[in-house]
Regions:
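Glycine-rich phosphate/pyrophosphate-binding loop regions near the starts of catalytic domains
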Residues: 20, 39, 74-268, 276-286, ...
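Single conserved hydrophobic/aromatic residue that forms the stacking wall/gate
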Residues: 1-6, 10
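A common structural junction motif
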Residues: 377-387, 495-499
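Active-site-proximal betaalpha loop/short-helix elements
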Residues: 287, 291-360
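A glycine-rich phosphate-binding loop feature that marks nucleotide/adenosyl-phosphate handling sites
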Residues: 7-8, 87-98, 169-177, 208-224, ...
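Helix N-cap motif at beta-to-alpha junctions
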Residues: 363-372
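N-terminal beta1-alpha1 cap of cysteine-dependent amidohydrolase-like domains
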Residues: 406-530
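Short, low-order "capping/linker" segments at domain edges
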Residues: 13-52, 396-452
Length: 530
């Protein structure tokens, strides 16, 4: 429809709500501001004077920092929220949809580190849609409004790897969960909804749909005592945007560059730890909660989109659960190659804050020759642009100001820690020996990942020798109940030069069709036949 025609349709359909639903009773709710008070025992024994420069510490103190970071890294990577979710992915059939342009797995080793999902609109086009999710429920315990802004920001940074016309072309669905009926829970929901509305209005992101579950609490009685468990106010943002060309997207897989390096890009210089996995592991109380403004997110979005469109950014991974240490680790796992990161910068925060804070940001792979140009562009948009280090080797190394190793682990060991929970679940659910074999494959250097091994001779003249374009052999695509993939099969044959025909079993039983009419037969399998 043209804009004028669409406007006429909208006007004709624009009726007052009272015409559809009658006079709705509007209940007035009064909620009072309360201050959350947390009395949690401090269990952190490390204090590096809130400074990344620990080079001046005495050897004993420095060794204590090293041990703490190593322990923290393993605990964070093996946390169920952070760890590999392959047990959820491999149980499903990933081959059904022929228009899936990007699923969870990335690279030749098929590691589940994709930031987004992407689909094609047809078998013959390169345009499609990108989908991502954002959620930060742990933050709402401390700051409900910030949790919703961060959820939107996470959804946006997850789809930043895909060129999108503008941030306003993003549409989202909001899924609300809360334990309403109590003052503080009602207040948090009000704050969350209001913050989300204002934030998305500023960005131009529309939220036309959503759902809610507002009785997220369970109660029980035991030994004459009453117990209650409540869900914190949670908003899950599912975002989607149209994509003109899915081939222009980048992933967590590195490109083969002349002089590659890794760079941190952040919209602000905060490294707050409230609501982080690090806080959860050590049961520690922090005062400041991560947050972001609409202007900061828009600046980051525009910078990354420009860098991808100009082919200056070649790989990207966002910072989310687990912090930048997890982001860098997952890049290492995806590419089976290590990195050497330097903490020599001016952030004035402790190593723990830098490595485990879950503030919004991204790590990008660029050519070192583009450092100056991109840094100037980032600074012009009020962004933090920090060189991190080089790619290479088989270890993940973190160096201090004097280039001494603050942290050094083999990436295969780290990936096994990251995959531990998924492996344990597979061992219970699936064949135990198969799960163990898959887990052990992580540490095998002989594992080359996916590769094509053509064991047949291809004709020198290709498919032209078959003269398919002129004669177009007819192939019957047979289907029945429970069949899936017949459309994809037909599309593949058509692409190869065949003439595909849709044949149902009922057509054969009723003798409406005869297989003698066709030059070939393709039978697609289905779930109904086990």
């Amino acid at each position: 429809l043209s804009s004028s025609a669409a406007s006429d349709v909208y006007k004709r359909q624009d009726v007052p709500l009272s015409m559809l639903f009658g006079e709705l009773p509007l209940e007035k709710k009064v909620v009072q501001e309360e201050k959350n008070v947390f009395n949690v025992e401090q269990k952190i024994a490390i204090d590096a004077d809130n400074d990344l420069d620990i080079s001046e510490l005495d050897p004993k103190a420095k060794e204590s920092v090293k041990k703490h970071i190593e322990k923290s890294a393993e605990n964070v990577l093996s946390h169920p929220t952070v760890g590999s979710k392959s047990f959820l992915i491999t149980i499903g059939d990933r081959s059904v949809g022929g228009m899936v342009a990007r699923d969870q797995f990335v690279g030749k080793w098929q590691v589940p580190t994709s930031n987004y999902a992407m689909s094609l609109r047809s078998f013959d086009d390169v345009c499609g849609e990108v989908i991502s999710i954002g959620e930060r429920p742990a933050l709402s315990i401390h700051n409900a409004a910030a949790s919703m802004r961060m959820a939107v920001a996470e959804a946006v940074t997850n789809m930043m790897s895909v060129p999108i016309e503008s941030i306003s072309s993003i549409r989202a669905s909001a899924n609300w969960m809360a334990a309403c009926g109590e003052n503080i829970e009602d207040l948090n929901l009000r704050k969350g909804v209001e913050a989300l509305s204002n934030f998305c209005i500023d960005l131009g992101i529309a939220i036309p749909v959503g759902k809610d579950s507002l009785s997220m609490r369970t109660t029980w009685e035991k030994d004459q005592s009453n117990f209650t468990v409540k869900s914190p106010m949670t908003g899950i943002i599912s975002a989607m945007a149209p994509v003109k060309d899915v081939r222009t997207s980048i992933t967590t897989e590195y490109k083969n560059l002349e002089d590659p390096c890794l760079v941190l890009v952040k919209p602000n210089n905060f490294f707050r730890l409230n609501g982080s996995i690090y806080q959860d592991i050590f049961e520690t109380s922090f005062t400041d909660t991560p947050d972001i403004s609409s202007e900061e997110l828009l600046n980051l979005f525009n910078f990354i989109q420009s860098g991808i469109n100009k082919k200056n950014i070649h790989a990207l991974h966002d910072i989310s659960d687990g912090g930048i240490l997890t982001t860098l680790s997952e890049l290492c796992f995806t590419n089976k190659i290590g990195c050497s990161i330097s903490l020599d910068n001016n952030f004035q925060v402790s190593p723990e804050q830098f490595l485990f804070s879950e503030e919004i940001g991204v790590v990008i792979q660029i050519n070192e020759s583009k450092l100056k140009e991109l840094k100037q562009s980032a600074h012009s948009q009020n962004l933090i642009f920090q060189y991190l280090g080089k790619i290479g080797g088989s270890n993940f190394d973190i160096l201090d100001k004097n280039k001494d190793k603050l942290f050094s682990r083999d990436i295969a060991e780290l990936e096994q820690a990251w995959s531990q929970v998924s492996y344990r679940i597979k061992s219970i659910r699936d064949n135990k020996d198969d799960a163990k074999s898959e887990f052990d494959l992580i540490s095998k250097t002989s594992n080359t990942g996916l590769f094509a091994n053509d064991s047949f001779k291809q004709p020198k003249k290709g498919l032209k020798i078959l003269n398919l374009l002129k004669n177009k052999p007819k192939v019957a695509i047979l289907r029945e109940q429970g069949v899936n993939g017949q459309n994809e099969m037909a599309a593949a044959f058509i692409k190869a030069g065949f003439e595909a025909h849709d044949i149902h079993m009922q057509d054969l039983l009723e003798q409406k069709k005869d297989l003698n009419q066709f030059n070939g037969l393709a039978v697609c399998g289905g779930f109904s036949y086990g």
